[in-house]
C-alpha cells in the first residue's frame, strides 16, 4: 500500500487561511533548512521534495482551490508531471532510442543502446548504481574479445555474431591464468599442521613434539583407507570417532604410539577433529589424583582392550602417567592438632565417659570405657586418619570454620545436658555409642544416642527438694488436698474481691471487662502456676473472669490504665474465710477510660445499661449503643462553608492584572490609574439580619462590573435533608437569583430564611456572601462613575475619534484638538443608575500614549488598552449568558422569592 501523503499545510507549518506571503516565507525558510546541500540528514531529500510539492500546489490559486476542496485527489492527476517541463520529451526520446518499434522479426540478440535517463529534480530518474551493475554484468566477459570490432550502430544488420567469439574467449583467454591448486596443497597443509601442533601441545616432551612435527606429511590415501576399522592400527572411541595407534612417517613407515587405554583420556583435555594424534596427549596428575594414589583401595587397570565398546553412561576414570609427578608444595598432608582434638570421636566420647565414670566409681558399676571393644577403637582410629586426610585438602578459612563448628558442638554436648538425680542403683545406665557420619570432610554425631535407653523418655517431675530455692514454696493443705501459695493467693484474691465490689456498678463492670492487663499481668509474673482459691459463700461468689478479646478495645478506643509491663503491688492480708467479709485495699491504680472513650449518648436514645452476666453481653450492649448513636442526626455547631467561585476565573484575573501592570509601566503610570483609589476594607452589617439559625454559608467572588450594572447573580448550591422518621439523608439542588447593587464595593451579604440544611428539626437559614473583585478601569465615586481612555498624541493635538468606555460597552467620541494629558471629560446621563429613571454622570480621564502611530496604522498601545478594557466587558456578558441559559431551560414558571429575602440584602455605605 502506498504511503499516505502529508497535508501540504502541515508540511509548510501553515494554517488554511494563510495568504501568499505566508506561503512564500514558509517555503524559503524550510527550503534553506532542508536543502540537501546544507542538511546531511538521511531524510532531508525526502522532506525537501515534500516542501517543493506543497509550495507548487499552494502557490497556484487553481491547484490550491482544488486541494482545499478535494484534497490530494484534486491535484494528483495534474500535479504528478508538473514539476518537470520536458518529461514527455525525454519519455518519447527513450522509446526512440530503445528501438522497441523497429523490425520485430530480427534476432533479439541485438544490443540495445543503454542511455541513462536524466535525473531531474527529486521526483524522476533512475539509479546510476543499478545501471552500472547491469552494464557490468552484460559486458564483463566479452570486453577482451570485442576490441577489434567496430562500434555498434543503431541498425540490426550491423550487429556481428559474437557467440563463436565468446566460446573462444572462454577456452583460451583464461586458460593460462588458472593456477594448479593441487600442487600447493602439500606444503600449505604441512605448514598449517606444524603451526597448529605447536600451539595445541606446548608442554609435551621435546622428543615427542619433534616426532609429531616430522610426521605431518600425508601418506597415500590408499594406505589410510585400508587400515580404517582394523583394530591393530586404531579403535573407535565412545563418540564413534576413529583414533589411530600410530602414524606414517615421511618414508611411509608405520610408527607406533605409546600404548595407553583410549578411555583413560581425561575429559578436560582439548582435542581437534583435523588432527589424528589426540590419543597421544599426555595426562597430568592433579592434586586429587595424588590423594587418590595414596588412599586408593582399588588398582587402576591400564591394559588396552582390543576393541572398545561405547558406554551408555561414561564415568570419569582417574589415570596415571608413566612419569611420577611431584605434589604441589602448598599441599601439606599432615593432621593439625586442632582438628584432632575436635574431630576425634574417641576423645569426644571420652568427655562423656568422664562424667559417667565419676558416678560409676561411686556405685561400683561398670563404666562405658569398659564396654568399648578393641575393634571399635580400631575403627575410630581409621576414621580419624580419614578425617585428617580429608581436612588436609581444605583451605585455611574452611579449616578454621570447621574447628569453630565442631567446638560449638562439643560445648553443647558437655553443658546442655542437665544433671540427673535418678537413683542409679534402681536401673543400670546403658549408654549407647554415638553414631557418626562423614560428609565432605566433616564429622557429624547423632546426639540422640547419649540418652539413657532404659529410662522413660518423659521423666517424672522432680520433688520439691530439687526445685529452685528462689521460687516460693507452696504449702499443701492436708485436709482439702489443695496446694496454695501465700503471695500469689493474696494477689489473686485481692483482684477478685475488687471486681466483686465493683460488679454492682454497670459502668464499672463494662470497664472491668475492657481491661486486658488485669488478667495478663499476673500471668507474666515469674511464679509457678497455682490453682486460684474459691469463696464458698454464695452471696460473695464471683463468676470466673472470661478471656479478653481484642475486638472491643479496638472498636471503642479504650486504653487500659495499667500497662502490660507494670507489676501489681501485693499486700499481705489474711486469707478469706467463708463467713468473713473482706474490704479490699486499693492495690491497683483505678480503672478509668481515657479521653478517647465513647461520647455519652443522649438520655432518651440509649436505654439504661443492664447488669451484664457475660463479657459477650457487655460487648453487645456497647455495640447497640454505638449503633443508636450513629443513627442520630449530627447537628454541627459551625455552619458549613460552600465556595462557589470558579477557580479558572481567579487564574484569568491574575493574568489580566499582570498585563495591565506592564501597560501602565509603559505609560509611566503606577500599577493602577491615578483616579483608582483603594477603598477601605470595612463591613457594615444590617442589624435586622438574624444569623442565629444560619447553618449554611455560600461564598463567591464576582467582578465589580456586574455590581455597577446591577445585574442578577445566579446562585447554585446543594443542601442536605434528613428524614426524622428513617434518619435517611438526601440532597436537594437549589438555584437562586440575587439582585446586585452598584453601592457594594467590598462584599454583599444576604440571608435567605429556610434555604439552609434540614437536619430533621426544621430548615436552617442560608447566608450568601458575594465578594467584589475590584475593577482596573472603573471606579464609582461620590460624583459618579470614573473611567479612562488612551489617546494618541497626534489625535489629542489635532483632534479626531477616540474610544470611550461606559459601564455597559464602549463608544466613539469626536474630540477637538488641544487635549492635554490627564484631561477630564464629563458625559451626562451615561454613568450608573442613581434612581430607576435617572443615571449619573460618566467621567473619562484622557492619557497620552508613550508612542505615536505610524502613518495610517492604529497606535499599538491604544489598541492594547482597548483590548484590556474589553476583558471586563466579556465577564459582564458571560454573566448575562448564564442567566439567559438558565431562563431558557425553565419549563415551568419560576418560583420567586419573597420580598423579605430581598430586603435582607446588606449593602455598604460610603
Swiss-Prot record:
Record-linked InterPro entries: DnaJ-like_chaperone, DnaJ_C, DnaJ_domain, DnaJ_domain_CS, EAGR_box, EAGR_sf, J_dom_sf, Termin_org_TopJ
GO cellular component: cytoplasm
Residue spans of biased composition, Acidic residues class: 357-379
One annotated GO biological process: protein refolding
J domain boundaries: 4-73
Start and end residues of each stretch annotated as Disordered: 102-160, 260-408, 451-486
Gene Ontology MF: a single term: unfolded protein binding
Biased composition (Low complexity): 273-283
Name of the molecule in the record: DnaJ-like protein MG200 homolog
Organism lineage string: Bacteria, Bacillati, Mycoplasmatota, Mycoplasmoidales, Mycoplasmoidaceae
Amino acid at each position: 500500500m502506498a504511503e499516505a501523503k502529508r497535508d501540504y499545510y502541515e508540511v509548510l507549518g501553515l494554517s488554511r487561511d494563510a495568504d501568499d506571503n505566508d506561503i512564500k516565507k514558509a517555503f524559503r525558510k524550510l527550503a534553506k533548512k532542508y536543502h540537501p546541500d546544507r542538511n546531511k540528514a538521511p531524510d532531508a531529500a525526502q522532506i525537501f521534495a515534500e516542501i517543493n510539492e506543497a509550495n507548487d500546489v499552494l502557490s497556484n490559486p487553481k491547484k490550491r482551490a482544488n486541494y482545499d476542496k478535494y484534497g490530494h485527489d484534486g491535484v494528483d492527476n495534474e500535479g504528478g508531471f508538473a514539476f518537470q517541463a520536458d518529461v514527455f520529451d525525454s519519455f518519447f526520446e527513450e522509446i526512440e532510442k530503445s528501438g522497441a518499434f523497429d523490425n520485430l522479426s530480427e534476432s533479439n540478440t541485438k544490443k540495445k543502446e543503454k542511455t541513462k535517463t536524466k535525473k531531474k529534480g527529486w521526483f524522476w530518474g533512475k539509479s546510476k548504481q543499478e545501471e552500472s551493475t547491469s552494464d557490468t554484468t552484460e559486458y564483463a566477459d566479452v570486453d577482451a574479445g570485442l576490441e577489434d570490432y567496430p562500434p555498434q550502430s543503431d541498425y540490426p544488420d550491423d550487429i556481428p555474431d559474437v557467440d563463436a567469439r565468446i566460446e573462444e574467449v572462454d577456452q583460451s583467454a583464461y586458460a593460462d591464468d588458472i593456477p594448479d591448486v593441487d600442487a600447493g596443497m602439500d606444503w600449505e597443509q604441512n605448514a598449517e599442521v606444524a603451526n597448529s601442533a605447536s600451539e595445541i601441545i606446548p608442554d609435551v616432551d621435546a622428543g615427542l613434539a619433534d616426532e609429531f612435527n616430522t610426521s605431518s606429511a600425508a601418506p597415500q590415501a590408499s594406505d589410510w583407507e585400508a587400515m580404517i576399522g582394523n583394530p591393530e592400527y586404531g579403535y573407535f572411541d565412545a563418540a564413534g570417532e576413529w583414533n589411530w595407534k600410530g602414524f606414517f612417517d615421511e618414508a611411509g613407515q608405520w610408527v607406533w604410539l605409546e600404548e595407553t587405554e583410549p578411555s583413560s583420556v581425561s575429559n578436560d583435555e582439548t582435542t581437534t577433529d583435523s588432527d589424528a594424534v589426540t590419543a597421544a596427549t599426555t595426562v597430568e596428575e592433579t592434586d586429587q589424583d595424588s590423594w587418590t594414589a595414596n588412599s586408593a583401595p582399588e588398582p587402576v587397570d591400564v591394559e588396552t582392550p582390543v576393541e572398545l565398546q561405547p558406554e551408555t553412561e561414561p564415568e570419569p576414570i582417574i589415570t596415571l602417567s608413566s612419569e611420577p609427578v611431584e605434589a604441589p608444595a602448598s599441599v601439606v598432608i599432615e593432621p593439625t592438632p586442632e582438628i584432632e582434638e575436635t574431630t576425634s570421636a574417641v576423645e569426644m566420647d571420652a568427655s562423656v565417659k568422664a562424667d559417667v565414670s565419676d558416678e560409676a566409681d561411686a556405685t561400683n558399676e561398670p563404666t562405658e570405657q569398659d564396654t568399648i571393644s578393641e575393634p571399635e577403637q580400631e575403627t575410630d582410629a581409621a576414621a580419624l586418619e580419614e578425617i585428617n586426610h580429608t581436612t588436609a585438602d581444605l583451605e585455611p578459612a574452611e579449616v578454621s570454620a570447621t574447628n569453630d563448628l565442631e567446638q560449638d558442638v562439643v560445648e553443647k554436648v558437655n553443658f546442655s545436658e542437665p544433671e540427673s538425680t535418678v537413683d542409679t542403683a534402681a536401673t543400670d545406665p546403658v549408654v549407647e555409642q554415638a553414631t557418626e557420619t562423614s560428609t565432605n570432610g566433616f564429622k557429624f554425631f547423632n546426639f540422640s544416642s547419649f540418652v539413657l535407653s532404659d529410662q522413660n523418655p518423659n521423666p517424672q517431675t522432680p520433688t520439691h527438694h530439687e526445685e529452685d530455692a528462689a521460687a516460693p514454696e507452696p504449702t499443701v493443705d492436708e485436709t482439702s488436698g489443695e496446694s496454695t501459695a501465700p503471695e500469689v493467693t493474696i494477689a489473686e484474691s485481692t483482684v477478685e474481691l475488687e471486681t466483686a465490689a465493683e460488679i454492682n456498678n454497670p459502668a464499672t463492670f463494662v470497664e472491668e471487662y475492657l481491661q486486658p492487663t488485669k488478667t495478663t499481668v499476673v500471668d507474666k509474673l515469674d511464679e509457678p502456676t497455682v490453682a486460684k482459691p474459691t469463696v464458698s459463700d454464695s452471696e460473695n461468689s464471683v463468676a470466673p473472669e472470661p478471656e479478653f478479646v481484642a475486638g472491643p478495645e479496638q472498636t471503642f478506643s479504650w486504653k487500659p490504665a495499667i500497662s502490660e509491663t507494670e507489676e501489681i503491688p501485693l499486700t499481705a492480708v489474711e486469707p478469706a474465710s467463708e463467713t468473713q467479709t473482706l474490704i479490699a485495699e486499693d492495690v491497683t491504680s483505678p480503672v478509668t477510660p481515657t479521653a478517647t472513650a465513647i461520647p455519652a449518648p443522649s438520655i432518651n436514645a440509649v436505654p439504661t445499661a443492664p447488669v451484664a452476666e457475660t463479657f459477650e453481653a457487655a460487648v453487645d450492649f456497647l455495640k447497640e449503643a454505638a449503633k443508636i448513636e450513629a443513627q442520630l442526626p449530627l447537628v454541627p455547631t459551625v455552619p458549613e462553608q460552600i465556595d462557589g467561585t470558579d477557580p479558572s476565573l481567579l487564574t484569568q484575573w491574575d493574568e489580566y492584572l499582570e498585563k495591565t501592570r506592564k501597560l501602565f509601566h509603559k505609560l509611566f503610570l503606577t500599577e493602577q490609574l491615578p483616579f483608582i483609589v483603594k477603598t477601605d476594607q470595612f463591613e457594615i452589617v444590617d442589624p435586622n439580619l438574624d444569623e442565629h439559625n444560619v447553618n449554611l454559608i455560600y461564598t463567591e467572588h464576582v467582578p465589580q462590573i456586574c455590581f455597577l450594572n446591577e445585574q442578577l447573580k445566579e446562585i447554585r448550591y446543594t443542601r442536605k435533608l434528613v428524614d426524622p422518621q428513617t434518619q435517611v439523608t438526601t440532597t436537594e439542588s437549589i438555584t437562586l437569583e440575587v439582585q446586585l447593587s452598584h453601592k457594594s464595593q467590598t462584599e454583599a451579604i444576604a440571608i435567605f430564611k429556610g434555604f439552609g440544611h434540614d437536619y430533621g428539626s426544621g430548615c436552617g437559614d442560608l447566608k450568601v456572601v458575594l465578594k467584589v473583585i475590584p475593577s482596573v478601569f472603573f471606579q464609582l465615586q461620590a460624583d459618579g462613575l470614573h473611567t479612562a481612555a488612551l489617546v494618541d498624541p497626534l489625535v489629542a493635538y489635532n483632534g479626531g475619534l477616540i474610544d470611550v468606555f461606559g459601564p455597559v460597552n464602549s463608544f466613539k467620541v469626536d474630540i477637538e484638538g488641544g487635549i492635554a494629558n490627564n484631561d477630564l471629560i464629563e458625559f451626562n446621563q451615561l454613568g450608573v443608575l442613581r434612581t430607576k429613571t435617572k443615571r449619573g454622570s460618566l467621567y473619562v480621564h484622557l492619557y497620552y500614549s508613550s508612542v505615536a502611530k505610524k502613518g495610517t496604522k492604529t497606535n499599538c498601545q491604544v489598541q492594547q488598552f482597548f483590548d484590556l478594557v474589553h476583558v471586563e466587558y466579556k465577564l459582564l456578558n458571560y454573566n448575562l449568558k448564564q442567566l439567559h441559559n438558565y431562563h431558557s431551560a425553565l419549563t415551568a414558571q419560576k418560583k420567586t422569592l419573597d420580598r423579605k429575602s430581598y430586603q435582607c440584602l446588606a449593602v455598604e455605605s460610603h
